[in-house]
Curated annotation (Swiss-Prot):
Record-linked SUPFAM superfamilies: P-loop containing nucleoside triphosphate hydrolases
Keywords: ATP synthesis, Hydrogen ion transport, Ion transport, Transport
Gene: atpB
Family membership noted in the UniProt record: Belongs to the ATPase alpha/beta chains family.
Function, as annotated: Produces ATP from ADP in the presence of a proton gradient across the membrane. The V-type beta chain is a regulatory subunit.
GO biological-process terms attached to the record: proton motive force-driven plasma membrane ATP synthesis
Entry-linked HAMAP family: ATP_synth_B_arch
Identification of the protein by name: V-type ATP synthase beta chain
GO-annotated molecular function: ATP binding; proton-transporting ATP synthase activity, rotational mechanism
Pfam families: ATP-synt_ab (PF00006), ATP-synt_ab_N (PF02874), ATP-synt_VA_C (PF22919)
Organism: Borrelia turicatae (strain 91E135)
Highest taxon listed in the record's lineage: Bacteria
Amino acid sequence: MKRVYSKIESIVGNVITVMAQNVKYGELAIVRSKDSSSLAEVIKLDRDKVSLQVYNGTIGISTADEVKFLGHPMQVTFSENLLGRIFDGAGNPKDGGPRLEDDLIEIGGPSANPAKRIVPRNMIRTGIPMIDVFNTLVESQKLPIFSVSGEPYNELLIRIALQAEVDLIILGGMGLKNDDYLTFKDYLEKGGALSRTIFFVNTANDPVVESLTVPDISLAVAEKFALQGKKVLVLLTDMTNFADAMKEIAITMEQVPSNRGYPGDLYSQLASRYEKAIDFEGAGSITILAVTTMPGDDITHPVPDNTGYITEGQYYLKGGRIEPFGSLSRLKQMVNGKTRDDHRTIMDAMIKLYASSKESIEKKAMGFNMTEWDEKLIKYSGMFESKLMDLSVNIPLEEALDLGWEILFSCFEPKETGIRTELVEKYWPQKKD
């Protein structure tokens, strides 16, 4: 069977077309020119007409260059030696360390059999009150972080990477600015978390096709570690860059565009990645947190809109804080009844009072007379935002719950909170003499 072809039919953008037989979708090839060689991936099959996306671009490639098909899809090394290392979107070392070429595994495989999934039952502690108390992150959950450009979403991921109580962090960056890449690298090194982290990164200067491989490589490695009993947290940023890379390639391929120019299979492409989140019976788990930026703060944009149908809630980052009203963890009820007996009560009471405070703040801004109750709510709102909502707050769950009681004590009488008497008697702070 012929695997080497010496004629390229056409070159359009970063896509080349070759007439070849017995080639599979997703198969890798090497394009050899006079001065260099580049990896390429089969992205379209039309009988014997094969289209390949060239990773390093087509500059310097001519129609007389050689294309050699490798007979397998993208692969990545799997071993404990990955820990503490940084790689690009093709799995090549980016940290100056040695190449790892043993124990190769294929990426982009199917999600695990649903019959092997177990009901989520364990909390992942992060030290961030707006997550731990109000929208608990659950092991094997898949959650996006919706945000607009300019919000500290990467800083939030760094905090989670440093503090999350998991065995292993896999960080996947797509279309990262070089400054953001260096920030991740520096904080992970200084915080001592790099030793339990594997970092796959595609920067804005790297080939756009690598944005598509970063989630697949990250999740393939995560699945192997999970099957070995590891509790793995996969952090991805930014899934909108991933979707934009899909859009760019689809335009090059002259595919019929769907909503706002994105390809028609955007939903299934996103779902195939998010559905990798799983808790294996008798083994480990994969939990996915993925930043999704919203152009113009538009929740109806195709990427966040499709994502919302796939995931189990979302964290909504706005004004430098995790917004309680736009955020939701649909699995929190699976675990927040097992933490402390006042967890759900504090969560519900504080959010209800915070919602009421917004009405009082609006009344004050419009010049209405303030009642004593309005003044209490406004005071409470300020304390809640500064002591619990601020992303710089870093305390364990139990301390956050105690702090919640302190805030309520500072602003209200027990009967004004709507909390059950038995919990008030157990947790309400005592007045100091």
